[in-house]
């Protein structure tokens, strides 16, 4: 069978990897490189070269079991990574990292900001209360409506929840008020972000995430059409 696959993101690459064994597969990619969200660039610093991932960065063995199996099959190695969260806002001149007390008060003025302490209290409250969305199976309420309805402060919303969402989804902050609250909370719950303790150990691919692209695409690389965006897809009655 002749099969066309659109995109060389992880889904497209895996689909082509499996299907090309028994079918004639052609992959169409709009970018000029293979990998989609998987993109590693080399950064030179003080004479040393460092691979930096700009898209897919981390995973963990608890919530990415199929990805782990794939990496094992491909013979790709990974290693533990530290993961932290920090915020810097030029507009409000606020900077903090809630990991430790010292990083929280990285700006001395934070000691005199009651909003910082209130925001931390609200973060614990959100972790506790957000589970109710999952229990209620509420798929309609938006994140903005939920936070407003629960009376969360603008400081918590704009300097904690939205920046964290931006970091995870690389999305425009203006979109998050309309983001489904259930999807947001479910992702947080699945990845241990609602827990203060017992969070999963995050891992990174040695040498950058590009390391798995070559072995994953080796069997069909010559059938990838780069810089070839798909304009339309038509379904024919006989197919």
Please report, for each region that a protein language model flagged, where it lies by residue.
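N-terminal glycine-rich dinucleotide-binding loop that anchors FAD/FMN and/or NAD(P) in oxidoreductases
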Residues: 41-67
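Glycine-rich FAD pyrophosphate-binding loop
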Residues: 20-44
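N-terminal Rossmann-like FAD-binding beta1-loop-alpha1 element of flavoenzymes
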Residues: 2-27
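Helical element adjacent to the flavin cofactor pocket in flavoenzyme catalytic cores
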Residues: 186-238
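Conserved donor sugar-nucleotide recognition element shared by glycan-biosynthetic enzymes
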Residues: 37, 181, 205, 209
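Mobile amphipathic helical/loop "lid" adjacent to a hydrophobic cofactor/ligand pocket
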Residues: 61-181, 185-186
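General small-molecule cofactor/ligand-binding pocket signal
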Residues: 26, 79, 223-227
């Amino acid at each position: 069978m002749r099969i066309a696959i659109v995109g060389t993101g992880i889904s497209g690459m895996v689909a082509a990897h499996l299907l090309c064994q028994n079918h004639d597969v052609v992959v169409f990619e709009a970018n000029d490189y293979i990998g989609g969200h998987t993109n590693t660039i080399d950064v030179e610093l003080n004479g040393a070269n460092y691979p930096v991932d700009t898209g897919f960065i981390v995973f963990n063995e608890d919530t990415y079991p199929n990805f782990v199996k794939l990496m094992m099959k491909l013979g790709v190695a990974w290693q533990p990574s530290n993961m932290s969260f920090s915020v810097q806002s030029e507009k409000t001149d606020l900077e903090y990292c809630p990991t430790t007390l010292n990083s929280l008060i990285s700006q001395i003025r934070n000691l005199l900001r009651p909003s910082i302490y209130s925001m931390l209290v609200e973060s614990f409250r959100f972790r506790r209360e957000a589970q109710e969305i999952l229990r209620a199976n509420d798929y309609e309420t938006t994140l903005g409506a939920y936070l407003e309805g629960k009376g969360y402060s603008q400081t918590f919303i704009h300097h904690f929840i939205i920046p964290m969402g931006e970091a995870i989804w690389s999305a425009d902050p203006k979109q998050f008020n309309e983001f489904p609250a259930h999807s947001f909370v479910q992702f947080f719950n699945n990845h241990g972000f609602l827990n203060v303790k017992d969070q999963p150990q995050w891992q990174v691919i040695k040498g950058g995430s590009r390391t798995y692209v070559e072995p994953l695409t080796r069997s069909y690389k010559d059938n990838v059409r780069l810089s070839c965006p798909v304009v339309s897809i038509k379904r024919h009655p006989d197919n």
